[in-house]
Amino acid sequence: MTNGKSTVTIHMGASLDGFIEKKDASVDWFNTSDSYPDGAPDPDVEAFLKTIGCYLMGSKTYELALRLGWIYGDTPTIVLTRRDLTTDRKTVEFYNGDLDLLLGRLREQYGSVWVAGGAQVAAELIRLKLADEISISILPILLGQGTRYFEYFQQEQHLHLKGATAYRNGVVEVRYEILK
């Protein structure tokens, strides 16, 4: 958390071997049929989503979300892109500029900033020390190949474990503070 007011959290769903999508860019493996009876009840996703002030994502993640079915509702969504994209969604804003200025505005305006992807966006936010936390939902699958979430990250970064929860659906959520 920065200044006690806002948090920028990088979130990802990943296979146990660290991939966020298959080689063909599919994410059909996100639906797990695993069962872990000793796990915590599956989280109340709807209640959690109400705590997010805005989403931040790259254009590839945005385009994937449109193809799969928009799950972000009317929550403000900022899409980082160098391309000239258009949308009919009133809550989507395209941005190409200084990330420090953008994050300052988003922290002030929305408080909770949830980085929904992708790998290049996450790497840049960590490199610039603009993100506060990383939340990884590890799914019970090994993909062997595809896109790794931290594929573009090229430096050492120390983290502090904030918590871990194993859920009944076999997903393990791990939360880290990014040490600055």
Language model features by range: what are they?
Residues 1-180:
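Enzymes that bind and transform nitrogen-containing heteroaromatic metabolites
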